[in-house]
Each structure stands twice: as C-alpha cells, then as structure tokens.
Design a protein with these regions (language model features):
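An N-terminal boundary/leader segment
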Residues: 1-54
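A short helix-breaking turn/cap at a secondary-structure junction
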Residues: 188-275, 322
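Short helix-loop capping/hinge segments that flank enzyme active sites or metal/cofactor-binding pockets
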Residues: 73-93, 249-257, 303-332
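Flexible, acidic loop-helix segments that line cofactor/substrate-binding pockets
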Residues: 43, 234-241, 256, 262-264, ...
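Acidic/His- and Gly-rich active-site-bordering loop/insert found
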Residues: 53-55, 63-134
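Acyltransferase
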Residues: 24-29, 58, 271-294, 317-322
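Short, well-ordered beta-strand elements within core beta-sheets of diverse protein domains
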Residues: 13-19, 79, 97-102, 207-214
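Short glycine/serine-rich loop segments
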Residues: 105-229
C-alpha cells in the first residue's frame, strides 16, 4: 500500500497497480478521503457516489488478480464535467432547471472511459449551462481566487488531488483557462478528435472536449482513450490518429521554434504574468520570433462572442423559453 496515493498521477498509479504496490480500492478510498477533507472548501463536485466507485474498484482489482485483459485506464478514478450524460448519475449542467436530471443516454466518451477500465467517480461542477455565470467552486491554491470556467470543477478536482484525471469541455477557453488558473495540465485537442455526442451543446461551431491531469503523459493517455470516430458527432474525424502518449514521451526530432504574438490584450495582464512570460521568452532566446498580429485579431473576441451567443440561443431555445425565470441575469 502506498500512503497518500491520491497524490499519484494516473501513470504512477498504473505502474503501482502493475507492481502490486497499490490496488484500485486503495486508490479510490484515498481519493474519496481527500475529497471529504477538502471539498467543503473547494466545492469541485456536483455529484459523488463513493459506494458505487468502490464497487467498481473492487471489480477492477478482481479482474487484475484473475490475470484478465485490462484497459489503458483500468482502475483509475476520473471526474466528468456535469454536462456529460452518464447513465445512473445525474447530469445537471450547473442549473436548477436540470436539478436531479437523469438520463439513460451515455455519452460516447463515457463509453470509451468504461471500455478502458476507468472508474467514473462523479460529476464535477460547471458554470451555468457551461457559459459565463460563475459557480461556487474555488481555486484550491487560494479560496479567494477563481478556478476559472467553465470547467471549474474538473480543473479544481485535479489540482486538489481529488482525482488524477478529469474531463472538461471548451467553447471559449474553458479547458485551458481553468487549467492555467489551477496549475494543472489542460489539453484541448484538435476539433473532432473526441466525440461530443451526449455532451450539452452550446455551440455546434465551437464546442470541444478536453482533458485535465497532473502530468503531460496523463493528458496524452486520456486523449488516446477518448479519441475515436463517432458518426453521431458531425465534426468527428475519421482519419488515422497519432498516439499521443508515444508522442509526449518522445524526444523532439528537431529543435522547436516558436512565434510569440503581442496580443491586443496583453496590457491587461498582471505584472507577475508579464514578468513570467518575459522570463520564458528570454530562456528560449533565438527559438522565439516575436511577431505583431494583424489589427483584425482584436475583432476575434467579438466574433467569437456573437457566434457563441447566437448558437446557445438556438440550441437551448426550448430550455430558455420554458424556464426563463430560472436563468441567471448574466446568461439572459
């Protein structure tokens, strides 16, 4: 048994499973203990069922001891953003409109996780309908600070050592922003790599699924598991996919070169953020070329907002029409 196993990355836990130093039950119990100790302050979880998770962990351990085939995430607990349909768990989308909502439908990405042997520990908090209205989730490093949104709970849960992996979604920075705020790895792969089937739709043009973890290898592994073609997602990619984990662990074949754009909103950054960026650019030295973006780049923020607002009004028209009094003023 490994003490404080909740601190392990998914890759470390898988190695410990293989060597017999750790069981899935021990890991899940450790994660649940960490949640009980800290989530009153962080509020990362919208739904948690420890008993079901432990039953799944026991089955994972039984399969492993029997020498049967195991998947890439066998016995690893994972959190899901609460806009992803998961049979036998509520999907409430951060709004009282869907309080207690359950469906028999299972998102394709949930099927992929279960096929890989992952344990769905519960649902992580999202902003209202995965849009802009903030929730109660706090930043694990400082409860006075925001964890970022809209995948607030997923990023906070990984940063607080509640789970080694979590799934989020991004329409306007909703994976990479909370990952940055909470200090975790966040990865939003190419559009169409991970199926959106069974995920709340707010913008057919912009919605995407992403991953959170505490190491580069972990987010690569999770992306490999989730990635697949899905005929029910109109943008799903049918082309061959590179193995992300292999790529993440390989040496770069050439010295990478980078372009740095001084964006129109850099003047809004804090002094600490600007100093940090400049320090990285100085370390990279000749590998970086500083470039000035076109003036029209500033218009992209307005364009993105118009697309998002128009499409969420389309996709959720029935919800808005029938429940207008339960919609926040910010979303209205």
């Amino acid at each position: 048994m490994i003490q404080d196993s909740y601190k392990l990355t998914a890759s470390e836990a898988l190695d410990a499973f293989a060597s017999g130093r750790l069981s899935s039950v021990e890991l899940v119990k450790s994660c649940i203990g960490q949640i009980k100790a800290t989530d009153d302050r962080i509020k990362a979880w919208a739904f948690l069922d420890g008993n079901v998770a432990l039953a799944q962990a026991e089955e994972c351990d039984r399969i492993r001891k029997a020498g049967l085939a195991t998947g890439a995430l066998h016995g690893i607990p994972v959190g899901l953003k609460d806009i992803i349909d998961t049979a036998k768990m509520p999907t409430q989308c951060g709004t009282p409109i869907f309080s207690g909502r359950r469906t028999d439908h299972v998102a394709r990405l949930v099927e992929r996780l279960r096929e890989a042997g992952a344990i769905i520990l519960g649902k992580t908090v999202t902003t209202e309908l995965a849009f802009v209205h903030a929730n109660e989730t706090r930043n694990p490093h400082n409860p006075d600070h925001s964890p970022g949104g809209s995948s607030s709970g997923s990023a906070a849960a990984v940063a607080a050592f509640h789970v080694p992996l979590a799934v989020g979604t991004q329409t306007n920075g909703s994976v990479i922003r909370p990952a940055s705020f909470c200090g975790t790895f966040g990865f939003k792969p190419t559009r169409g790599v991970i199926s959106r089937s069974g995920v709340l739709q707010t913008s057919v043009s912009l919605d995407q699924v992403g991953c959170f973890g505490r190491s580069l290898a972990d987010v690569a592994l999770l992306t490999d598991v989730l990635g697949c073609y899905d005929q029910y997602d109109t943008v799903s990619l049918a082309r061959p996919r590179p193995n992300m984990l292999t790529g993440a662990q390989a040496e770069a074949p050439v010295t990478p070169e980078f372009a740095w754009f001084d964006l129109p909103f850099n003047d809004r950054l804090s002094t600490d953020a600007r100093d940090g960026i400049e320090a990285v650019l100085e370390i990279l030295g000749p590998q970086v070329t500083r470039m000035q973006p076109a003036d029209t780049l500033a218009d992209l923020v307005t364009v993105q907002a118009r697309i998002h607002e128009y499409e969420i009004a389309q996709h959720q028209a029935e919800v808005f029409d029938q429940n207008w009094d339960q919609i926040s003023d910010i979303l209205k």
